[in-house]
Curated annotation (Swiss-Prot):
It catalyses: an N-acyl-L-alpha-aminoacyl-tRNA + H2O = an N-acyl-L-amino acid + a tRNA + H(+). One of its GO terms (cellular component) is cytoplasm. Its EC number is 3.1.1.29. The keyword Hydrolase applies. The active site is at residue 21. Monomer. It holds the Pfam family Pept_tRNA_hydro. Transmembrane segments: none annotated. The record marks 94 as: Stabilizes the basic form of H active site to accept a proton. Hydrolyzes ribosome-free peptidyl-tRNAs (with 1 or more amino acids incorporated), which drop off the ribosome during protein synthesis, or as a result of ribosome stalling. This is Peptidyl-tRNA hydrolase. HAMAP family: Pept_tRNA_hydro_bact.
Amino acid sequence: MAIKLIVGLGNPGQEYMFTRHNAGFWFVLHLAQQFNITLAPDKKFHGVTGRGQIHGHDVRLLMPLTFMNKSGQSVVPMVKFYGIDNDELLIAHDELDIPAGSIKLKTDGGHGGHNGLRDITPHIGNDFHRLRVGIGHPGHKSKVSGHVLSKAAPDEQIAIDSALSAAFDALPLLLGGDVEKARSQINGFKLPE
């Protein structure tokens, strides 16, 4: 199946826009900009939504405005309203367990402690596609909140942006339904030495 809905998880508000936790938002914002898709507030879905053509495929975009730990309040109604099957759903989110500059495409699995996914999976299951954008782990769990809610250092941000570019390059495969080739291309990305 082809991807019909791309969700970018993050927190609303200018104070959070450039924090690591908003890596999913960055992905969707870049898509909207690159493919001239207008994003607008949509009260029905508690988020910012858009629809347009990406590499010849009709795709909806969503950025929940519910704060991360309430992402299900936005994602679930949109999935149900448009009849999006889980194999047609891609959720982009930050991932602590992957170093900055790495990116992974995964299907299935638990929430891995990610509060946005934790709020979504009880309602739709966990067999959807996830674009896991590495932001690195601060080392101790007591530092996680401060880490995800702060800006990446300039070298980390460059690494994250490079990883996101690798995902953009694989989009034609993913949108066309060739998930395995897209996964191989995305998961094989390595930062230049």
